[in-house]
Curated annotation (Swiss-Prot):
Catalytic residues (UniProt): 383
Biological process, per Gene Ontology: glucose metabolic process; glyoxylate cycle; tricarboxylic acid cycle
NCBIfam families: PRK02946.1
Binding site for ATP: 327-333, 348
Annotated GO CC locations: cytoplasm
Keywords noted in UniProt: ATP-binding, Cytoplasm, Glyoxylate bypass, Hydrolase, Kinase, Nucleotide-binding, Protein phosphatase, Serine/threonine-protein kinase, Transferase, Tricarboxylic acid cycle
Protein name (record): Isocitrate dehydrogenase kinase/phosphatase
Localisation: Cytoplasm
Protein function: Bifunctional enzyme which can phosphorylate or dephosphorylate isocitrate dehydrogenase (IDH) on a specific serine residue. This is a regulatory mechanism which enables bacteria to bypass the Krebs cycle via the glyoxylate shunt in response to the source of carbon. When bacteria are grown on glucose, IDH is fully active and unphosphorylated, but when grown on acetate or ethanol, the activity of IDH declines drastically concomitant with its phosphorylation.
Length: 605
């Protein structure tokens, strides 16, 4: 820009900036209130209430943005504010953020509002926050009544057992613990099993984030152990062993275990953060290498995560030279998928037209993606980032990809200043398609992949999700070896499905027919018919029948549906259930109801 205002002379500019910040502050207050309510719901064991709260919080941000846009249009005729005033609005906003506790999130809110009002030609750092303006380094809430981001404990003074007990009791959870000294003993034993004996350095200390992380039926204590130059992460899930009684379920001591519980295939945590950047910085120390965008998303600030991701993409494009290409693998009927090999994500666009047998619409597919966003994903469904008006340099697009885009999605394309602007797309983490993983893998890979696939579908089933198209190509294998579902255009609630057995053939002609001899309704599912599509490879068939022979029995599916209709919410664990204390150290527990279901070593990661 050639001219930037030297004098902030516009009263409207200040008023608009203040109005936008007031609306952001309202949004963040509601965000924090949800986390406080989550603690109460958790203490009372109100799991349906927690699910409702998590769903409502996901839509809250867009509601607040819409409200803010309406206020600006009604009171300030925002669409007709001239360019110089918009520049002053941004500068006033920056000034208002100098002592703010969530400046990075407030900047993102500003962008969201502006993108609803301004043409995309204004999406530059002159008018919106393409780059952050306010530093979040060393940001802390220093108000007397505020909780610190984390608390430091020194086991060398009072001993490790006493310190661990103080850490747990400081969260002041209302229900009593079944046997907290026993659980503390299990934590200490697990630490010894993992690290053996270690000498305590002068700086031996434990840092614990001041708020609990709530998700599903667990509340997580998250922290780090510091000893000499070592930083050891940990997370302790607290669960109800029976109504009104709590227990420490396990302790997770490996970075890869924490990476999974904070992973992109899980629903967002509810956690009360006065200074979110300080929480994210802390989490970065225990999960180095995990992008800040993913961490912000995992703690419920998905719009901030989305903003950071887009900045990461622009930065990567500035420091790379490879081209976007059509994604390897079997082409989908509904989605056009492409990727940048040097960037670990895929870009998915809904096609303009769908060939038979697909009978759906763009609006219906977008609603399916929203269903997944709102639903508890249990570590088995990939999160997606949804973007509008994405401009990609034409010079970075492979010619074959451009031809495919012009063929399949011409209605969503616009050429502008050397860029191809795509009206709407989704972005997901890139995974190895399960069909390729099974096709190219060793025998042990095949066993792992098939076992994970069956577990994934069964866990989705218990969570009221019917994948629809269950072919292996619609599932991916993450870098941690977990199988995750990522094709959502045929997804349905299991409770909306009619589970049926295949009727016996009426005669020999029926038996030899390649077509069903029975009527099939739009919501009918026939688990007995899945075998031919899933068991064609002899290696896969043998392993599948070894681990998941019940998969093709309609009774399995109907039982899950019946429990859901009765309001039952099953237990899920984002870690191997063999790590649960009641399984790992059974002698410490004796005969207790904590062991119910522990033998099913599911991985709901």
């Amino acid at each position: 820009m050639n001219h930037f205002p030297k004098l902030l002379s516009s009263q409207i500019g200040f008023d608009v900036a203040q109005t936008m910040l007031e609306n952001f502050d309202r949004h963040y207050r509601i965000f924090r209130e949800a986390a406080v309510e989550a603690k109460t719901l958790y203490e009372h064991g109100d799991w349906h209430g927690l699910q409702r709260l998590a769903r409502e919080r996901i839509t809250s941000y867009d509601d607040r943005v819409k409200e803010c846009v309406e206020v600006l249009e009604d009171e300030y005729d925002a669409e007709n504010i001239d360019d110089e005033v918009w520049q002053q609005i941004k500068l006033h906003y920056i000034g208002l953020l100098t002592s703010h506790r969530q400046p990075e999130c407030a900047e993102t809110f500003f962008n969201s509002v502006c993108c609803k009002i301004l043409h995309r030609s204004y999406f530059s750092n002159d008018f919106i926050f393409v780059r952050p303006a306010i530093s979040t380094e060393y940001l802390e809430n220093d108000e007397p009544a505020a909780k610190p981001t984390y608390r430091a404990y020194y086991p060398g003074t009072d001993g490790l057992a006493t310190t661990l007990e103080r850490i747990v009791t400081n969260f002041q959870l209302e229900p009593a613990f079944d046997d907290l000294p026993r659980d503390i003993g299990c934590v200490m034993q697990a630490i010894h099993d993992e690290f053996g004996h270690f000498d305590e350095a002068p700086n031996f200390q434990i840092h614990v984030l001041s708020s609990l992380f709530f998700r599903n039926k667990s509340a997580y204590i998250v922290g780090r152990i510091i000893n000499a130059d070592r930083v050891l992460p940990f997370a302790v899930p607290i669960r109800h062993v029976r109504p009104g009684v709590l227990s420490l379920d396990t302790v997770l001591l490996r970075r890869d275990q924490l990476m999974i519980i904070f992973g992109f295939s899980h629903s967002y945590f509810l956690v009360d953060m006065g200074v979110p950047s300080a929480y994210v910085d802390f989490l970065c120390t225990i999960m180095p290498g995990k992008p800040k965008a993913e961490i912000y998303t995992s703690v419920g600030l998905q719009k901030q995560g989305k903003n950071l991701f887009y900045r990461d993409l622009l930065h990567h494009l500035s420091h790379s030279s490879d081209r976007f290409i059509i994604a390897p693998g079997i082409k989908g009927l509904v989605m056009l998928v492409f990727t940048l090999p040097s960037f670990p994500y895929v870009f998915k666009i809904i096609k303009d037209h769908f060939p038979p047998p697909k009978e759906t619409t763009r609006a219906q597919i977008m609603e399916k993606y929203q269903l997944v966003k709102r639903h508890d994903r249990l570590g088995r469904m990939a999160d997606t980032l949804e973007y509008s008006s994405v401009a990609l340099p034409i010079a970075r697009l492979d010619h074959a990809l451009v031809r495919e885009l012009e063929k399949e999605v011409p209605s969503l394309l616009e050429y502008e200043d050397g860029n191809l602007v795509i009206e709407h797309l989704y972005i997901e983490r890139r995974m190895t398609p399960l069909n390729l993983y099974l096709q190219n893998g060793s025998d042990s890979d095949v066993e792992h992949g098939v076992k994970e696939y069956g577990n994934a579908v069964k866990e989705l089933m218990k969570a009221n999700i019917f994948p629809g198209d269950m072919l292996y190509k619609n599932f991916g294998v993450t870098r941690h070896g977990r199988v995750v579902f990522y094709d959502y255009d045929e997804i349905e609630y299991l409770t909306d499905c009619n589970v049926r057995r295949v009727p016996p053939p009426r005669n020999e002609e029926d038996e030899l027919s390649g077509e069903p001899w029975y009527t099939v309704g739009p919501h009918d599912i026939f688990p007995e018919t899945y075998g031919p599509f899933l068991l064609g490879d002899p290696r896969v068939r043998d392993v599948f029948m070894k681990h998941h022979a019940d998969f093709f029995d309609p009774a399995l599916w109907q039982a899950s549906k019946d429990k859901l209709i009765q309001g039952e919410l099953p237990d899920f664990y984002p870690y191997d259930t063999a790590l649960r204390f009641c399984t790992r150290y059974p002698a410490r527990f004796g005969a207790t109801d904590q062991n119910d279901g522990a033998g099913d070593a599911q991985r709901a990661a």
